[in-house]
């Protein structure tokens, strides 16, 4: 399923000991955290065209051969989808929206208990 470790593949360049894919995988999974999205917005990352283009590039994780590497594909891909919208990138700067998304995510992660 997974490819051999980078140390066994000398043809794959490393960045700080990790492959580009490993770094992108870790980063894209961070996008599932609404508080992190709020942080990126407050730091003005979403105002940078090159960063927005990078978010678009990361949509390759929605492809079946890559989605299997995501720990939480639903929230990760939903965040990536929302980040393609300029309005969302502007609105996530408000802590209220980040909080609302976090609460919704927690509700969806925990099965509801019935009496």
From Swiss-Prot:
GO cellular component: core mediator complex; mediator complex
Keyword vocabulary terms for this entry: Activator, Nucleus, Transcription, Transcription regulation
The keyword Lipid biosynthesis belongs to this UniProt entry's keyword annotation: no
UniProt keyword annotation of Transcription regulation present: yes
GO MF entry, a single one: transcription coregulator activity
Localization (cell): Nucleus
Segments crossing the lipid bilayer: none
Location (main, coarse): nucleus
InterPro entries with a match to the protein in the record: Med31_sf, Mediator_Med31
BP-aspect Gene Ontology terms: regulation of transcription by RNA polymerase II
One Pfam family this sequence matches: Med31
Function: Component of the Mediator complex, a coactivator involved in the regulated transcription of nearly all RNA polymerase II-dependent genes. Mediator functions as a bridge to convey information from gene-specific regulatory proteins to the basal RNA polymerase II transcription machinery. Mediator is recruited to promoters by direct interactions with regulatory proteins and serves as a scaffold for the assembly of a functional preinitiation complex with RNA polymerase II and the general transcription factors.
Description of how the protein assembles with itself and partners: Component of the Mediator complex.
Similarity-based family: Belongs to the Mediator complex subunit 31 family.
Protein name (Swiss-Prot/TrEMBL): Mediator of RNA polymerase II transcription subunit 31
């Amino acid at each position: 399923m997974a490819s051999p470790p980078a140390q066994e593949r000398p043809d794959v360049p490393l960045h700080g000991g990790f492959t580009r894919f490993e770094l992108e995988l870790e980063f894209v999974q961070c996008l599932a955290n609404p508080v992190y999205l709020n942080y990126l917005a407050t730091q003005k990352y979403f105002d940078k065209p090159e960063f927005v283009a990078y978010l678009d590039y990361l949509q390759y994780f929605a492809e079946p051969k890559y989605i299997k590497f995501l720990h939480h594909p639903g929230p990760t891909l939903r965040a990536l989808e929302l980040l393609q919208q300029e309005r969302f990138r502007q609105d996530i700067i408000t802590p209220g929206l980040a909080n609302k998304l976090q609460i919704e995510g927690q509700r969806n992660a925990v099965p509801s208990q019935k009496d």
